[in-house]
Amino acid sequence: MGKRKEGSYNFDKNVQMFLACAKDDNRPAMECVYFKGDWAYASDGHIIVKNRISECSNLDEAMIQALDGKLLHSLFFKDMLKYDDILISDDGIECHKKNDKAFFYFADDNLKYPNAEKVIQSYLAKPSVP
């Protein structure tokens, strides 16, 4: 990961998961990055990206747990990467860079993200073609 100030937290700016998200008003959950356990998922319905949060960020365990089950819109994820430091709350992510602050709310709790892990495992279980 790139250099960070001591005590600042964020995702690695090279991990641009927002690029894998759908741009589809009919499937708003797919426009989001989904956090489950120590994993972050993004999909457009054709491809799925899965990254271990503890490897693509410098977030501590409490911050990773606070993300569990949350959806963050892809545009918010993209903008979040522009900041030096993030704080995670129940409602969203507060971002800081010098005197600039922003708050990105998590997506509506009524949105349901598809079971990406089930899709990945079913694909991996298929026999390979020689």
State what each model feature region is:
Residues 1-130:
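Extended macromolecule-engaging scaffold surfaces
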